[in-house]
């Protein structure tokens, strides 16, 4: 896990989830965001006998980790959050080592054949031809979607108050991402994720459809 707020949040979440299965990590290894040599950390994982490694790190650290493990003959099942779910990017920078990695997902895969997704893809070609169509481009669409829906509900008489009221009226709104619900008290929106796996030729393989987090504290 990355030795910062992001990594530590992931570590704590992993601990809580494993505890529901009466399990715990056999190794918890911090790395600095800019660390370049992970030899000792990866050897520690290998020597521990860990069959699965959960990563909460940035793409560069993840790449170094996988390449290091390839040189020492260590092949665990890698699992990560949606932070590393851009399979096209990760496959390229790891030299193909990303195949088989399991991650969370923001929404539909960039290659999905869906009317709304196809519309967004064509719009991207027209209005942002210099940008690479992929998971994080699509994530921006997912994140902006509730605001677009609110603006549609407000109509021409736009104001801050009217927009906020429309946002707070959104219930189970879903397009290409998870269902989103906002209220005046709660703006978390959702805690649902999909689980996907990187297959051959950067194929997105759906392992688990939208699933809500039963441990989410914002609901309680």
List the model feature ranges, each with a label.
Residues 26-30, 101-103, 195:
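Conserved beta-strand scaffold positions in the cores of enzyme catalytic domains, especially
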Residues 141-148, 161:
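A structural signal for well-ordered alpha-helical segments within the folded catalytic domains
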Residues 67, 145-153:
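Short glycine/serine- and small hydrophobic-enriched flexible loop segments
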Residues 46-48, 71-73, 93-97, 158, ...:
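Extracellular/periplasmic catalytic domains that process cell-envelope and extracellular macromolecules
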Residues 152-165:
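Short, charged, surface-exposed loops that flank catalytic or proteolytic processing sites
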Residues 1-73, 111-118:
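Extracellular/periplasmic Venus flytrap/periplasmic-binding protein
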Residues 66-141, 211-215:
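Extracellular/periplasmic periplasmic-binding protein-like sensory domains
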Residues 115, 168-220:
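Solvent-exposed, acidic/polar segments of extracytosolic/periplasmic ligand-binding ectodomains
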